[in-house]
UniProtKB/Swiss-Prot annotation:
This is Fumarate reductase subunit D. HAMAP family: Fumarate_red_D. Anchors the catalytic components of the fumarate reductase complex to the cell membrane, binds quinones. Its main location: membrane. It holds the Pfam family Fumarate_red_D. The lineage of its organism: Bacteria, Pseudomonadati, Pseudomonadota, Gammaproteobacteria, Pasteurellales.
Length: 114
């Protein structure tokens, strides 16, 4: 018989943020390293272009994605890594995911202020 009142979990939204962070880290960071670590120092790209991009609405969305999602992925890995090595933090989910949420709001307001 099917349980009519299944227990709900907070894992699906957290896994969504975790997987988005992994994808952003894997796909966008090499490009970011190329642009900021190689092309910008050698003068191939002007700093004015990067500043103009960061002031555009699409640039702000990119900055948000490049900062918020990897933080969720990192704190999710840290939370589950602590369990793997048998270090159980009381209210660990609340602490780690709460830190990620606070960081997300701080970054959101900082990027809006650009």
């Amino acid at each position: 018989m099917v349980d009519q009142n299944p227990k709900r979990s907070n894992e699906p939204p957290v896994w969504l943020m975790f997987s988005a962070g992994g994808m952003v880290s894997g796909l966008a960071f090499p490009v970011l390293i190329l642009i900021l670590g190689i092309l910008l120092p050698f003068g191939i790209i002007s700093p004015d272009n990067i500043i103009a991009f960061s002031h555009h609405w699409f640039g702000k969305l990119v900055i948000l994605a490049l900062t918020i999602f990897p933080m969720w992925a990192g704190l999710h890995r840290l939370h589950h890594g602590m369990h793997d090595i048998k270090v159980h933090v009381p209210n660990g989910g609340l602490i780690f995911y709460g830190l990620a949420a606070v960081y997300s709001f701080i970054v959101l307001f900082a990027v809006i202020a650009i």
